[in-house]
Amino acid sequence: MITRRGVLAGGISAAASAAYGQAPLSSLVPMPRPTAPTPAGAAGLENLIAASPYQGAVAAVVADARTGEILQGHNASANLPPASTMKVLTTLYALDALGAGYRFATRVLATGNLRNGRLEGDLWLYGEGDPHLDTTGLAMLVTGLRDIGLREVTGALHLVDTSLPSIPLIDATQADYAGYNPAISGLNLNFNRVYLAWEQGTNGLQVGLDARADDLRPAVLGIGLTVADRAAPILDYRAETATAREGWSVARSALTGEGGRWLPVRNTAAYVGEVFASLARSSGIVLSRVQRATAVPSEAVVLSEISSTPLDGMLRSMLRYSTNLTAEVVGLRATQTLTGAANPSLRQSADHMAARLDGRYVSGRAELHDHSGLQDLSQMTPVQMVQALVAAGPRGRLRNLLRAHRVNDEVQAQIGTAEIVTKTGTLNFVSTLTGYIEGPNRPLAFAIFNADLPRRAALGPEERDRPPGGRTWIGRARTLQNDMLVSWLRGFG
């Protein structure tokens, strides 16, 4: 049951685009009053949309953030992809399940006997899925081993990544080289990306892969890399089924001057193991073998351990930088905690999140396929998004995690001193915006979904990086969104 007053009710009629008074979201059937005049200063949404060069679907709603009273809407019950505004729902889901202080641990454990710096036994690297673990974090674990005097391991380093299901990617429709479409595992490193760097040296082109973080640059040799004399494709990914070894081929024509880019890693355990072993060797610790394992023996003893930042800080970073890996990891961990399921798929986990939110934060079960919003199969209504914002409250923990809305000087002059905090979402021909407006009179909660799904579906694989007309379309969508914010602030805030 949702207890926050004014929350929940069905949507607004798709045709209701003029401003009107309406019963709060908590009523079973919204009762629009189309004859209510548009408040002074607020423009009718139909007029704003008609005056805009933007082309595509628009679904938008604004409500009183304290009572849930819907103040204005347009196609507000239309189901469209929320894109990365989905992370607002994931934030609420994870905080409810795990708590703001939850931390992910990464441990190095040992079985056997440690004598005079020599471990006659095995090491076990166990991860709880920390999405922020980077090479610096691994180096801290190695330092912990060195500080207790470890110098040699006679057995193997076992990699245990089974605390989360191993998922090779979030969205199968994305390009192989999309760094925002990473693998998910119980052992994640550098957001499951490896850095491709190149420069023109005295002996010609120098190219390589590394796991850089801060001032560390451990080379990564376990992922194949070749340079090919071709014009296209610039990047080509291959994975060997038998060995799970992955590799990249790069077009020489693209490697001009000095540069670099992050590439996704699919076999995350092998990547983590190689980097950890490299750091250990650099610290004088001899490791002979690295292999995967499914569990840590019960008799293993912790030798070194690090913990992630608390969940609320992790979520603040996720909402600011829209990190998909963080969203999927915290969503999966929340589902594991609530259901006891050890290996839910992304679809199963997202579906459980939708069921959990229904009746607590939203009215009706949204169609969710992930926790990040990367898949356009995930769809919901802007009314549902606003319901979640109202339920969370304009002074609640979600409000404090969202970032200030960034606008140009012209829009800022119209907003004045009002505070607007938002989460944005962007896919090809999808642009979404949701958040709170803190005006002089009352706080508002809003959601705006813009999409041209037929145009998105028509893109060929070679067009997805730079879709024809995509930049212009996004610019027009964002201008329309800002026009709505200014209108709502003037009329209702």
Model-predicted segments: where are they?
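N-terminal export signals
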Residues: 1-24
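Conserved serine DD-peptidase/penicillin-binding transpeptidase domain
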Residues: 22-49, 97-363, 458-463, 476-493
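A short, well-structured edge-of-sheet supersecondary motif
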Residues: 50-74, 292
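Short active-site loop at a secondary-structure junction
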Residues: 56, 73-93, 97
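Active-site-proximal beta-strand/loop segments in catalytic clefts of secreted hydrolases
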Residues: 63-65, 126-129, 160-162, 253, ...
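Residue-level preference for non-acidic, small/hydrophobic
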Residues: 68, 87-94, 157, 187, ...
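Short glycine/serine- and small hydrophobic-enriched flexible loop segments
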Residues: 93-99, 332, 387-393
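Small-residue-rich helix-loop
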Residues: 336-450, 455-492
